[in-house]
Amino acid sequence: MENVSKKLLVGAGVAFSLLFSPFSQAFAAEPTVGERKQVDNVAHRGATGYAPENTIAGFDLAVEMKADYIEIDVQRSKDGKLVLIHDTTVDRTTDGTGKVGDFTFEQLRSLDAGSWKGEQFAGEQIPTFEEILERYHGKVGILIEMKAPELYPGIEEQVAEALKERNLDKPQNEKIIIQSFNFESMKKMNKLLPKMPIGVLTSNRAHTTPEALQEFATYADWFNPSYGIVTEELVDEVHNLGMQIGSWTVRSQAAADFLFGMGVDAIISDYPDYVDPRN
């Protein structure tokens, strides 16, 4: 997942100028006959088809399965610790009940985040954001989803600071990307980390209009829709605006093959082995 462009390409003439630029022609070059375009393999919350989501076990397995990226969900504990969990409650993926933001970090850490997936995962803990950065940066790309940032005022600054402390906000560190369904949060992240690739998530066809895509292109590098709304025309339009496109959530080989055919740049899947045939 390269940080192809953004921000510099703003205004009414964006699509036209890109269409005829050498950069655009190189970016849009199709594979020769018999070749398949390189597609990034993103392990959705880790290898969640086989291991509990947002856990070290799931992320380690994704690395073992040679995923290009792990996707993580970042929220915050009551006492201000950045933690990894998808739902805004702990009910589905732990042995506890209640809202994530109502637990202290110590309380969250005491929960069993693995047994729901299988006895062999008993005792898996909710990881911290910092642990993931320390453990996996340099081994695998990290796609950071800001989960429900509207519930955690100031979380954007906190995430940005954690990245800056580790020198991960620089353009050479291209294998870290930040995304969210909350577009205002992503505009904020773009201002806080102007060199960091930004992605927008959606499952809404209303966000695929030319006008909407042009707005996203003013601050985002990635447009990441659910695969049910992906078309070849959408992929082409996203590319013409200088963005890349990654689609989710693949849970079958048929879905992966469909997205290969559409020409997307990344496939986000619970099963990294479904995406492996990219090579």
Regions found by a protein language model. Give the residues of each.
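Phosphate-group recognition and catalysis centered on beta-loop-alpha active-site segments
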Residues: 2-279
